Design a protein with these regions (language model features):
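Short, membrane-interfacial amphipathic segments enriched in basic
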Residues: 20-64, 241-242, 246
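Active-site cofactor/substrate anionic-group-binding motifs, chiefly glycine-
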Residues: 69-125
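Selective transmembrane-helix segments that form parts of the transport pathway or gating/packing helices
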Residues: 74, 78, 82, 121, ...
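Generic alpha-helical transmembrane segments of integral inner-membrane proteins
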Residues: 83-90, 174, 178, 182, ...
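Membrane-interfacial helix-loop-helix connectors in multipass membrane proteins
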Residues: 95-119, 186-228, 236-258, 278-283
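Hydrophobic alpha-helical transmembrane segments of multi-pass membrane transport proteins
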Residues: 109-152, 237
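Short cytoplasmic-facing helical segments at TM-TM junctions of multi-pass membrane proteins
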Residues: 142-167, 249-252
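Hydrophobic alpha-helical transmembrane segments of integral membrane proteins
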Residues: 163, 167-170, 262-282
Length: 283
């Protein structure tokens, strides 16, 4: 495996002796050690991202592998995202009905459900669900390839592992997350309407027209496409944790776990920032 100072193009950076990917439990002897470990990890992540971008824009492009990742990340995540979205829609509908009825604002119920699902619960639930499923899968898969030296073999065969393994998965995450979010939103709104229709007569047309009354593209598109940033975070961290793991089978488990925990954490933090930016630029 090439060292970070090697001039070999596309080489995977090997951790220095005793250095490993940022663990889930950051147990260190001092706060200074914690801070230095985090910034070292974050710097390595930035270098990894630059190497992936450079490989992604350099031919040849791995179209076949990208399409395979579309299916793996998008199609196979759809049932779980749909189920989570539907459950969220039902719970939100019941809670919103109870709260708005207490304040005499039951007429605003469809709009409250629509805006809550599209603006926040749909995107963040989709991001966390995909982070759990896809993050663990990518982290474990690439970590297994690393400890069994398959990545070394790919590099030895003159194939850039950043392009074949990382860029395709990250790009698939970026492109699939908005589509999965739309599917999750649709399921959430549909089940939100069902939950209301079981309580009082309310047609789907009435629910949609009342819920989307006054809505604009500024209300709909930015919250949906912020999940592309979630996709970047999930794919980048999962690939990074997987491709730099070490320690045999135990390392594979640590890579999978840390991929899920770290990507979920950064998705939540990114959501806070993106919500504020959306409110500033799309009031």
């Amino acid at each position: 495996m090439t060292d970070v100072n090697s001039a070999a193009v596309g080489g995977i950076r090997s951790p220095s002796p005793g250095h490993r990917a940022l663990p889930v439990s950051l147990t260190v002897n001092s706060s200074k050690g914690l801070v230095s470990e985090f910034f070292e990890w974050f710097g390595d992540l930035g270098i990894f991202f630059w190497q992936v971008v450079r490989a992604a824009v350099t031919p040849p492009f791995e179209i076949r592998e990208l399409v395979r990742q579309f299916d793996e990340i998008g199609s196979k995540s759809l049932p779980l995202v749909a189920l989570a979205g539907a459950a969220t829609g039902v719970v939100l509908s019941l809670e919103a009905r109870y709260s708005l009825t207490r304040f005499g604002a039951k007429s605003l119920l469809p709009a409250a459900i629509v805006f809550s699902v599209i603006h926040e619960t749909g995107p963040i639930i989709t991001g966390l669900v995909v982070s759990g499923r896809v993050g663990a899968g990518i982290g474990a898969e690439l970590a297994s390839m690393k400890v069994t030296e398959q990545i070394d073999a790919i590099e030895a065969s003159a194939v850039n592992p950043y392009r074949l393994l990382a860029a395709t998965r990250i790009l698939a995450c970026i492109l699939m997350l908005p589509l999965l979010t739309l599917a999750g939103d649709a399921c959430g709104l549909l089940m939100g309407w069902v939950a209301q229709a079981l309580v009082e007569p309310l047609s789907l047309h009435q629910f949609i027209s009342s819920g989307f009354n006054g809505a604009s593209f500024n209300d709909l598109l930015p919250p949906t496409f912020k999940t592309a940033v979630f996709g970047l975070i999930i794919g980048l961290i999962a690939c990074f944790q997987g491709m730099r793991t070490q320690g045999g089978a135990a390392g594979v488990g640590r890579a999978a776990t840390s991929s899920v925990v770290l990507s979920s954490l950064f998705v939540i933090l990114a959501d806070v920032v993106l919500v504020k930016l959306i409110l500033i630029f799309f009031p």
